[in-house]
Amino acid sequence: MKKRFFSALLALVLLLCALPAPVHAAANEITVYNWGQYISDGTDDSLDVIKAFEEETGIKVNYLTFDSNESMYTKLKTGGTTFDVIIPSDYMIAKLISEDMLEPLDFANIPNYAYIDENFRNQAYDPENTYSVPYTWGTVGLIYNRQYVSDEDAESWSCLWNSKYAGKLLMFDNPRDAFAIAESMLGYSLNTEDENELRQAADLLATQKPVLQAYVMDQIFDKMERGEAWAAPYYAGDYLTMVEENPDLGFSHPKEGYNIFIDAMCIPKGCQNKEGAEAFINYLCRPDISAANLDYIGYSTPETAAKEYMDEEVISSPVSYPDDETLARSEAFAELSVEATQSMNDLWLSVKTSGSNTTLYLILTLAAVAAVILFFVISAAVKKRKKMRRCRKWKQA
């Protein structure tokens, strides 16, 4: 009886051992979802942050990227991939909190949070600092090629509507950032929910379309760096990297106003390794790591302690750290209501599709004209050939 009991017990133990470990037990692996080109990766003698973290902690990092807050949000909503750390912007964090999509952080596992400056804590998007830890802050401005675009023109967002530069202008390919530029030009808040003001912004964006080369996001980096475009809205931090490769590039904080933002590290609901995620967040907050990381990506640090490790050229740059007068023209995004967001999305779709019928009509018209010309050319050639044949026959006769 005892033998049968122990045999059954042994069989049960072996069966349990054979079962795959539950996903949450994978304490040696995390998946991070971040903006493109937004972490020091070891190129140009920089610190490979992910590799250094893996070697120090033994935790493997699966690293994926997105190109806008909206695409990141859609990915989280639709599922399919589980993330442990995400790095959205301020207004998107507020949206994720309101929809109960973030895990509260255990700050006992993030002692390096102590290095985050008070000015970056308890922000409106996360007033109790329950769900987020600041990663960087920065501004959106106008990047332009000084060989082709004057400094005077680049002082205003209207540069992106200037027909002198037609075909060489780029625009953000997402509604929130595109509308922000139009709203600044019209003197409206970047957070307006007024339907009339949104429509005016959409109308202004529609007038820009004929002079644009393309609506793009991350591609702005390469197109401006290679000189394929002459002016585009983009992030101050990236400009400092781009200008090293193309010294002809300039940067301005347009006089009408611009967006200032904080990107912060969060843990989404459904994460598989919360402790590993908090270890990663804590690692990025370590002043020497933060400094090495931000020295490379060019964005501004929310840690005074990190500046002690950073290049003087970076921390004294008016692009990365604007003066008070320049900062006074900035405005942070706030979460918009569902209704205002939907209205903006609908208007953006109308902007993107406007003129498509006219373009199609023009293409069809040109094709028809070309067909008619080709018909007459061929007809003339056939008639000429027949005439030559008749002439030969007449001579032979």
Where are these regions (language model features)?
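Bacterial N-terminal signal peptides
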Residues: 8-18
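Sec-dependent signal peptide cleavage junction
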Residues: 18-27, 379-385
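Early extracytoplasmic/lumenal segment of secretory-pathway proteins
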Residues: 25-95, 361
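Extracytoplasmic ligand-binding site segments that recognize negatively charged/polar headgroups
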Residues: 33-46, 81-228
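A ligand-binding cleft/hinge motif common to bilobed small-molecule-binding domains
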Residues: 92-95, 231-248
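Periplasmic-binding protein-like
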Residues: 198-207, 245-271
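Mature extracytoplasmic/periplasmic domains
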Residues: 268-329
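Conserved C-terminal helix/tail region of periplasmic/extracytoplasmic solute-binding proteins
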Residues: 324-397
